[in-house]
Structure formats: structure tokens, C-alpha cells
């Protein structure tokens, strides 16, 4: 085996298999086939070996080629002095099994970068600590009630906070690049799309009425997959199908029971407070993680190939969405995060990959891994936040290939905890930045669709939403 290193995260491997090994595989394959071979003019298994070899030559050679590749790749993985993070890249059809001589083939494979582990012990860290106020609970409770508000079509001009049913058309020059079907949005100051932002959406749409057609601009993200269009403004036309005014429900005993069998408003407020505390803990963990990573990255410099970064984008976003879900953030918050991340994906993914490689290397050295019970705990927590069953959550994660992302999430959190325990930590009370009501609303629509656009699993559930108060969409799915 010959290994060359064209890049810090890439290896080119040439594998050479001796002729004797090829002949042994061929002999074993024919030994297995001859007793069962069906050749015209002979009973099954009675045809001469030479005739069997002639008739089944192509099939056996292809089978042997596959077996040799699988077995040799397994041995390469076992013996190699690198840690693979991807599958071997080669063209199976172009590899030929020679009639004589050695069997050689070549492949490339992405590997973990090699670097010296930063000194992570005895760091000095500041831990921001939030306090949840009654005003915070009031605001969160209003957001919960807003999701169960009755909506009535209105001829009155739209105001910030109203709901709009709109369609959209996006044009670059003379070319229509996408059209948006009917979307129900909250009229906010800014509209976030999957790959673009309309910064003055509130100003554009305020005072609009049913049937109005409003034109403006949206700006594509600086990290858009189409490099020529990064940061470019395109024309947007929004058509108002309907203006809807909301009427919040009253906290009657019947409504409290419908929400989640709460007996009093105080019980509901405690539920909402617990959700806010989980979100505050998440922000604290993220701030601590950011401080730790900043210190570790300062002494660990390594290159990342652009192809690796592009391939890891969706995987990294999946991992972060899982973190948001388990921490109780609602659907709109997650959608805003997803849109912002997509718009600046390249830079964010590079930073996250560096974090991952450093934390993974520390995990290897400290023998840290995810235990079966930890998977169950995470799945149980996600299930509780989404008012779903652990079995259904696990099935969804397995179906969408996110179990590996869950494993990374568990391992990286354990490493951060290890580093924090070894650090000198000073707590600092902080005030949560006030989130202006109706500042931004996010929708899942790509203004400029790309060929490689993997859908991010929608976060359909909201931790602030008490059990029993599922959306109609989820109730219908549960009936299936």
C-alpha cells in the first residue's frame, strides 16, 4: 500500500494485491460455483470445470473484483495511519481485474487533519448566567397564545404583527428565478428566506390590503452556493391574498385543560418558565463552548479542503438543529437560525468543522464516546420537547441519517463539560438581549434554488407548546 498526502485532509492510496492472492480468490469462487453450475447439456453440477470457467468467466471475475476490493479496503482501514472521515472515492467500473500479474487500484479518501492537540487544561473562562424574569414569562406566554389565536380576514390595512397570506415572485434582470406559493407569514420588520433576506419587509407591506401587489428587493446571502450571486439583490413581487387579524384566546379553565391539562394559569406559567430556563441554559452552554473553542483554535491551525466543507454543510446544520430542538426553541426560532446559517453557510461550516476535529481528537485521547443510555436520554428529551414518542423520534433520526449527528452532539458536549470542569470558571450575571417583537419572520423558500439543496428537517414542534396542544398538521400525521 502506497499513501501520498496531496492535502492535509486528503490521502491518495494505491493498493497492490499479489497475483497469488487473486488466483486464490478465483479458485475459491469457482470451487463454490462448479458443484451448482447449470450448463446446457449437463445436469446441475456435472459440467467440466474448464467449461464452467469459460461460461461464467465474466461473472466470477466481477464477483472476485468486488470481494478483493471490499477485503483490501477493510485491511487498509485497519492498518492505515490515518483516520478516515469519508468513504473511499473510486470508479468501480473503471477498475479491471488483470488476466496476469498484480491487481492494482487507486482511491482517494478524506481523513481527519493532523495537528497537535491544544492544551485544554486549566483554561480561564467566564460563564454568563441569565435570570428569567416575570416579564420574560409574560412575553413567552403571549407567543404561546398567539399560536392558538383565531384569525379573521379583514379589509383593514395590515399592521405589524398581523398575519398575511402572500405569494411571491423573484426576478433577476429579465429572468424569473423562483416563484413562491401561498405562504402565511407574520408581518414583521424583516422577512428571512432560506437563502435571502428582505430587510424592509415591514415597511413595504405595512398598510397593504387584500389584492395589493407590492414590489421590493431581497438580498441573497453572502455564502450562497452560487458564487456569482452571493450578496446580490434581486427584485421581489409580493401579492397579498389575505390580511388576517388575530384574536388571542382567553385563559379559561377549558382552554387550560385543552393546552395540557393545566389546572391553573400558574401551572402554565411554570411550564413556560421551565422552557425559558432550558433555552437560557443552552445560550450559556453555547457561550462557554464559544470561549473554549476560541482559546483552542488559537493554537491549532490546519487547512480544510473546500470539497470537505461543502459536503459537511448539511450534516453540521442537522447537528445544530438537534441541539436547538432538545433545548426547547420553537419552530420560528429554529427556522430563523436555519435561514441565517444557510445564508452564511461556508464560513460557519469551516468554523464548526475545526471545532469538531479538535473536540473529537480530545475525545479520542480521553477515551470519551457516546454510551447507549446517552442516546436514549437524548431521544427521550427530544421526544418530550416535540410531544412525540421516543420510538417515533428514533425512527425519524435513523431514517434521515441523523444518528451520527446525535452521536457527535453527545460526545462534543461531554468534551466541553470535561474542559469546563478542569477550567477556572467565573460566573457573570448577564441580561438576555431583548428580542424585539415582530422583528423577523422566517419562511422556508429558496429564492435562487441550487442543484445541491438538501432540505433541513422542519422543526414542527415548540417546547413552549404544552403537551396536548399539537398543531393540526401533527394531529393529522399521528392519525396515519
Swiss-Prot record:
Gene3D superfamilies: 3.10.50.40, Trigger factor ribosome-binding domain, Trigger factor, C-terminal domain. The gene is tig. One of its GO terms (biological process) is chaperone-mediated protein folding. Its EC number is 5.2.1.8. The keyword Lipid metabolism does not apply. One of its GO terms (cellular component) is cytoplasm. This is Trigger factor. The keyword Amino-acid biosynthesis does not apply. Pfam families: Trigger_C, Trigger_N. It catalyses: [protein]-peptidylproline (omega=180) = [protein]-peptidylproline (omega=0). Involved in protein export. Acts as a chaperone by maintaining the newly synthesized protein in an open conformation. Functions as a peptidyl-prolyl cis-trans isomerase. It is an enzyme of class 5 (isomerase). It comes from the Bacteria. HAMAP family: Trigger_factor_Tig (MF_00303). The lineage of its organism: Bacteria, Pseudomonadati, Planctomycetota, Planctomycetia, Pirellulales. It is found in: Cytoplasm. GO terms for molecular function: peptidyl-prolyl cis-trans isomerase activity; protein folding chaperone; ribosome binding. Residues 426-480 are annotated as: Disordered.
